[in-house]
Swiss-Prot record:
GO terms for cellular component: cytoplasm. This is Protein SUPPRESSOR OF GENE SILENCING 3 homolog. Residues 49-58 have a biased composition (Low complexity). It comes from Oryza sativa subsp. indica. It is found in: Cytoplasm.
Amino acid sequence: MASAGDRRGGGGPPGSGDDSGGGWETVEKRVKKPAQQVGKGQWGQWNSPNAAPAPTAPWSGSGAFHHSGNTLVRHSDRRPARGTPRPPPQNRSTGAELQAPRGVVTAPLANGWQWGARSCPPGTESKEGGLPLSGCDPETDNAEGDDTSDDDNDDDMSDDLSDDYDSDASEKSFETRKNHKLFKGFFEVLDALSVEQLNEPTRQWHCPACKNGPGAIDWYKGLQPLMTHAKTKGSIKVKRHRELASLLEEELSRRGTSVVPSGEQFRKWKGLREGTDREIVWPPMVVVMNTVLEQDEDDKWKGMGNQELIDYFSEYAASKARHAYGPNGHRGMSVLIFDSSAVGYMEAERLHDHFVRQRTDRNTWNSAHKVTFLPGGKRQLYGFLATKDDMETFNRHCHGKSRLKYEMRSYNEMVVTQMKQMSEDNQQLNYLKNKMVKKEQHSKLVEDTLSVVTQKLRETMEENTIVRNKAKEKHLEYEKEMKYQEEFFHDQIEKIHKPTEEKEIKFEKLLQEERAKARQSDVDSGSTEDRRQRKEKIQNFIDCQVKDVEEFEAERDKLIKLHEEKKVKLKKEYLAKEFELEKELDTALTALMDKHKPDIFKSSTSPST
């Protein structure tokens, strides 16, 4: 079989006759074949519809390849697979007990797969984990085989690497790199799959970069674990794995997809169907059946009237009613027409639901067990939302203007959109109402505050008026008192000035009298010398008197001038003190006004929302 080397075994279970050696089948180095045959032999199983259960089919105890008494031993330096691990074998101990003991595996070929397995007694595997017991240590048993396997694989692929991996991979075309014999079959499988199939999380893959080496038999569920393995492989054949990761990423990018991160495609849910819209009769109508009453003399059927029908369903706010008539009169079919709005449709739907809950809906009317008459002879009315077929049936015998006009409209457009708009408008209305209420509350608060402030201001103004009047009265009293004091002191000063003036008059009179006495003493009696001496004495007396008078007047003027200067100085000091008093009064009044200044009313620009 051409692909036996890839699947590491024959086509049937051990002991079935296909495995004559009684152990693992030794794989020889196959001759290079055309790419088409390699792709079919190696990757044909991956893209088959039954590829999902591949981990359990070839490798578990129930598949085509069973473990015998010999234990499958891994290489000592091999890391755990980064893809999805193979499921644990089921009923391993049962398979081992039913199998005949196998002989020792023969030595592998020089260029084949180096399986360093050793024979172990049957049943030595652990029933719980499938691990070899003591005496079959995979670390010690396969130490030599691992080294040989790695060396042989590296030697076997040396010609491939020298041709395709020694130079810069970016210098080669994408197609050339993809058609490498290691990857060609893998990418042929990818090309045969659709994008949806590529992204299936249950599809399993082998790593082509691990071909003919450790990890070649590992399965990876989905491309993401395979990509992670190729990007993080770090022990052997690193360059080959990085090349695979680069090619796979480029291939998926060219096909308009990408490796979905692990977990994104698992646990998918199926939601509602995409199309939720439907066509409805517009304006909304409810068909009411069994509205016929009786036949008249002309064998014509009579039925319910328009207003009578509306009155029967007055709780549902129908705007109009119409009845279907034919050659035989009333056909027993009537229609309640509702407003052309979302509210009208909701009313019609509410009436329809009422009929459904009462089990007098369309299904009951169309059934063979419908009840048209109730005990007592009353007719049972049936109703349901109108459809296009109902309207065509209603208009069957109507022509021209007598036909009931209607149109088929989108439910989402006429009902859902309007209901959403109504909801938004209602929310906006509630918002505006709340805003208006808050504004009114704020206005009332401002009005109350303004009233209180105005009242306080009025009271303050009245108090200020009273204070000003009292201040004026006090000022008048002070002026009167000051005027009285001024008159009093003026009188006192006059009393001082008057005696002084009298003294001055007496003084001048005394001087004049003495001068007159001196002049009268000048007589012609006596000798000339005596007269001359008397005249000189009189003249000296007069001159001394004149001199004394001049000195008196000078000193008097000096005293008056000094007195006037003192008065001016005193007045200046008085005015300065009066100015200081006025200044102190102004400062005290300013402080008093600041102390009793009313609070400033601050109105917010807008109420809080």
